[in-house]
Curated annotation (Swiss-Prot):
Gene that encodes the chain: dapD
Family, per entry: Belongs to the transferase hexapeptide repeat family.
Pfam families tied to this protein: Hexapep_2, THDPS_N_2
Keyword annotations from UniProtKB, A to Z: Acyltransferase, Amino-acid biosynthesis, Cytoplasm, Diaminopimelate biosynthesis, Lysine biosynthesis, Repeat, Transferase
Principal place of residence: cytoplasm
GO biological process: diaminopimelate biosynthetic process; lysine biosynthetic process via diaminopimelate
Catalytic activity: (S)-2,3,4,5-tetrahydrodipicolinate + succinyl-CoA + H2O = (S)-2-succinylamino-6-oxoheptanedioate + CoA
EC number: 2.3.1.117
This protein's name: 2,3,4,5-tetrahydropyridine-2,6-dicarboxylate N-succinyltransferase
GO cellular component: cytoplasm
Length: 273
């Protein structure tokens, strides 16, 4: 792996000196190997090691290099035609491949090649971008989008219209991460590398970026870029120091309890093989 990452890192630094037409075969092969690893889940842009999230920046660079090395080409889907650099993940898949993967894909859901969906993932009509990792038992509900290189944990529910931010444009240092057993309410947006820690529940219409104040009403503490584990978060406002106006904030109203779990529990019937 160190050799592969070294080739990618050096190619990224030197990318102004070659084009898709004259790219050295070693670089093209390394980029393809990295994208294939992201696609089958053996590689991921970020992973939790000893309780801390570690970002493998070289894989993000491999994704960016893949756009440089691949030309746009027509992509067919029944009567629809597209023109893009990245193939769709499930193009040409057989019934046996779908059964082996254990993924349910509801039309017209789209996942790009280079994204990974683990067993018992359900993709309602939604979009999963390149580099994203969606772990076991998660549902990506209708019109939800999982951005480039985003990391979605096990048994997560991304409700209708949810947006999970990517890293490619605008260029972000770290991917957005939703940890295991989280519930993200309809039309909420989690972006800019924010981490929603395990077991948290985000209400409808909550918008969280790196500059969003995340206020814990029980302790008075303000967090940035991280929702603490087991939090229940709703949209709200905090007053200015002079009391003349208020600005948007995400408010931690309580910790997840049995009542919250009952309202946000996952339906195993929807994930049965």
């Amino acid at each position: 792996m160190s050799q592969l990452s070294t080739i990618i890192e050096q190619a990224f630094e030197d990318c102004a000196n070659f084009t898709a037409a004259d790219c050295p075969s070693e670089i093209r092969q390394a980029v393809e190997e990295a994208i294939a690893g992201l696609d089958n889940g053996t590689l991921r842009v970020a992973e939790k090691i000893n309780g801390e999230w570690v970002v493998h920046q070289w894989l993000k660079k491999a994704v960016l290099l893949s756009f440089k090395l691949n030309d746009n080409k027509p992509i067919e889907s029944c009567d629809l035609r597209f023109y893009d650099k990245v193939e769709t993940k499930f193009s040409g898949w057989t019934e046996e491949q779908f059964k082996a993967a254990g993924v349910r894909v509801v039309p017209p859901a789209v996942a790009r090649r280079g994204s990974f969906q683990a067993k018992n993932v359900v993709l309602m009509p939604s979009y999963v971008n390149i580099g994203a990792y969606v772990d076991e038992g998660t549902m990506v509900d209708t019109w939800a989008t999982v951005g480039s290189c985003a990391q979605i944990g096990k048994n997560v529910h991304l409700s209708g219209g949810v947006g999970i931010g990517g890293v490619l444009e605008p260029l972000q240092a770290n991917p957005t991460i939703i940890e295991d057993n989280c519930f993200i309410g309809a039309r909420s947006e989690i972006v800019e590398g924010v981490i929603v820690e395990e077991g948290s529940v985000i209400s409808m219409g909550v918008y969280i970026g790196q500059s969003t104040r995340i206020y814990d009403r029980e302790t008075g503490e303000i967090h940035y870029g991280r929702v603490p584990a087991g939090s229940v978060v709703v949209p709200g406002n905090l007053p200015s120091a002079d009391g003349k106006y208020s600005l948007y904030a995400a408010i931690i109203v309580k910790k997840v309890d049995a009542q919250t779990r009952a309202k946000t529990s996952l339906n195993d019937l929807l994930r049965a093989d």
